[in-house]
């Protein structure tokens, strides 16, 4: 978002940031959030979990400046509990690595690297949620025709998946 504001980029793929009135956010994809636990964890093997059941365990959590942090905070608020944050991480692959090494459990996007790590991936039964990835652009910025065409292509290609 900062790069858009500084006009370093024409477009960005990101989480939606509230209170960004000068930016258009177009939803282009859904992203699944899951609970990731070490393979030998007592929640492993269950297939799915209520987020409230994760509250007693130390969590590897996204940093405050991550676009996912408010989304995950809101999910925990809906459970009526507060996670025990053991570590804060900016990048999801690093988060997965810490979980694999028994530093805690995590709520994070279901990313391909999880298949290669010593972790178990659990669907979130409750609370319900939807997470979107957005294409962002400045509302008042001139965009080259090729950029406009790319935006239209992304909207048409991914809009069907939403």
Residue spans for each PLM region:
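Short beta-strand-centered segments that line the small-molecule binding cleft or hinge
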Residues: 1-37, 95, 99-103, 118-123
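Short beta-strand-to-loop elements that line the ligand-binding cleft
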Residues: 15-16, 82-91
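Short secondary-structure boundary segments
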Residues: 16-17, 39, 109-112, 133
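Flexible hinge/capping segments at coil-to-helix
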Residues: 20-59, 144-145
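Residues embedded in well-ordered beta-strands
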Residues: 34-36, 105, 132-136
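Thr-Gly-centered strand-to-loop micro-motif
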Residues: 38, 62-63, 85, 108-109
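Secondary-structure junction motif
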Residues: 44, 58-79, 143-151, 161
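A late-sequence structural motif
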Residues: 121-162
């Amino acid at each position: 978002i900062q790069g858009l504001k500084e006009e370093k980029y024409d477009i960005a793929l990101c989480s939606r940031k509230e209170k960004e009135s000068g930016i258009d956010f177009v939803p282009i994809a859904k992203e699944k959030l899951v609970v990731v636990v070490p393979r030998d964890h007592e929640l492993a093997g269950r297939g799915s979990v209520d987020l409230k059941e994760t509250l007693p365990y130390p969590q590897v959590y996204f940093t405050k400046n991550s676009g996912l942090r408010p989304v995950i905070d809101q999910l925990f608020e809906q459970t009526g509990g507060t996670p025990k944050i053991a570590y804060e991480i900016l990048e999801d692959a690093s988060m997965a690595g810490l979980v694999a090494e028994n530093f805690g459990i995590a709520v994070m996007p279901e990313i391909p690297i999880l298949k290669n790590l010593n972790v178990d991936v659990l669907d979130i039964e409750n609370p319900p949620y939807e997470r979107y990835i957005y294409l962002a652009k400045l509302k008042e910025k001139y965009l080259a025709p090729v950029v406009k065409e790319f935006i239209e292509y992304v909207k048409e290609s991914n809009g069907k998946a939403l």
